[in-house]
Amino acid sequence: QCYVSQACFGRSANRGECAQFCRLPFSLVDADGKTIVRNKHLLSLKDLNQSEVLEELLDAGATSLKIEGRLKDVTYVKNVTAAYRRKLDAIFARRKEYTRASSGTCRFDFQPQLDKSFSRGFTHYFLQGRGGEITSFDTPKSLGEEMGTLKEQRGGYITVAGVKPFHNGDGVCFLDEQGRLQGFRINRVDGNKLYPAGEVPRIKPRTRLYRNFDQEFERILTRKSSERKIGVCWELADTSFGFSLTAADEDDNRVTLSFPYPKEPARTPQADNLRSQLAKLGNTPFEVAGHLSEEASGIRLNLSENWFLPASVVADWRRQVIDRLIVAPRVF
């Protein structure tokens, strides 16, 4: 816990109101009044990143993880949670003694990458012993992903030595000769030539260039690019007065509704049509568990005969059952 924000500004960092005291610039002066360091962010630490040691954390007994995300936007949260979700799922696939705390399956239409979201550089601090730089003295702002170095600068463009592609609209930053963070927005990209929007900043050759805003990546994240689906199993059965439809999800929630309906033998096989209708879960948080086959546990047809049931009737029953299942308690 940290109390410096409360002591200096009356805002408690332990209650989500940190005043970011540690991100301010300071000068370091010795006992003789000699300035050792001037106007550097001497208390600014890099961001904690334990994504590469998740398995060790699980083996040590960790059962939940806290992800840095105070005052971050939706694209940050989506990218970071997706990165950890994928790594954890890969561990769970190998280590059957571990299971996720919540139900469902998460899918992403993008490749998560932590250094594309806000970060001051990463550190694991002292989890694996002392070693490596943990501070970010030059700037408390986001550097982003390292893209290469400045090869040359002439006219209205700069040339980058690097293999990662830039996009129109990307944000680029660098540390100037005084160690101050500078940056510009790219107006146009032509191969490894970048044409900045506005005045071209003066950059020393071989200066490291970072991308702290990826236009294309942000565009992907702002649209629907992830979903979570909870597996559900169906059972359609006939009763003495009609039919019953049961849905059971991964959280052991179960809903059964009975529907009076006349029984009429069908002229053609109905199994495929019934499975198709029950599988249409659309924008609900559910999907059929398993595969749509006769042997699958996802959809079971417990019918004494090949009854005729119109698609519209089955669809209505399906909606009624799902509406009940949605409000059932579950772990998110």
What are these regions (language model features)?
Residues Q1-F332:
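Surface-exposed amphipathic alpha-helical tracts and adjacent flexible/coil segments at the periphery
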